[in-house]
Amino acid sequence: MKKTIIVMPVANEENTMQGVLNEILALPYDNLYIYPVIDNFSKDRTEEIIRNTALRSEKVKLIFYRESNGVISCYLEGFRQALKDGAEFIIEMDGGGSHLPKEIPQFIEKLEEGYDCVFGSRFMKNGNVSNLPFYRRVLSSGGTILANFVLGTHLADMTSGFEAFRRDILERMNLDHFLSTGHMYQTEMRYYCRNFHTIEVPIHYIGGTSSLKFKSVTEALRILFQLKKHEKQIFIQ
């Protein structure tokens, strides 16, 4: 398997962090690495847990991103570090237990088959969502329908954060020019990748305690109608 790095922003995940790291490290891959990205927002023992695990395993590398302005900037900083360290495959996933480590192999398999981007879907056949408030399900599924209509895409899930990319796809993007700083980032990424060789795979999503604020919804709608115009600033000529 080509060198694969998992990028996962984490903050205040002391109750789940060790379990997630252990599950990933138990996967049967010699060339799979974990890059948890943490910032000043995290106030509990999450950083300590990661550092202790990194002392025991060279496959774990903590990235402390002091310039972070939110989870999306941590994702993008993780991508930069993964590219710098020679990753051929980059996987993005949640570090708090919402995404299941046991589903990582299907992303690797599809990249090895030649796909450029692999997107996890909660809403396609065999996908599933649990422990998520009804209004969040409606917003996610309704947001997917609206995004597909406005952007001309045809995906079952436009807002999932479990996804994977070949190195050259991320290298072609200006990672400093994404519009989104919140939930809309996933939709923005899928839109930019629509003309590459992509595929969706079913995932099981376990909801957490985070809430979705009205401001996030209005920001998402604003950005949605700017993406087509903004796209030319993303790809490096």
Where are these regions (language model features)?
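A conserved acidic beta->alpha catalytic loop
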Residues: 39-48, 97
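Active-site beta-to-alpha loop of glycosyltransferases that engages the nucleotide-sugar donor
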Residues: 8-22, 41
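Residue-level signature of catalytic and energy-coupling elements of molecular machines
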Residues: 17, 24, 78, 96, ...
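Short beta-strand/loop segment that forms part of the nucleotide-sugar
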Residues: 8, 32-42, 63, 93
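Short, acidic, metal-binding catalytic loop of nucleotide-sugar glycosyltransferases
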Residues: 22-32
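Hydrophobic helical membrane-anchoring modules
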Residues: 1-3, 15, 22, 152, ...
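Acidic helix N-cap motif at the loop->helix transition within catalytic regions
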Residues: 15-19, 44-53
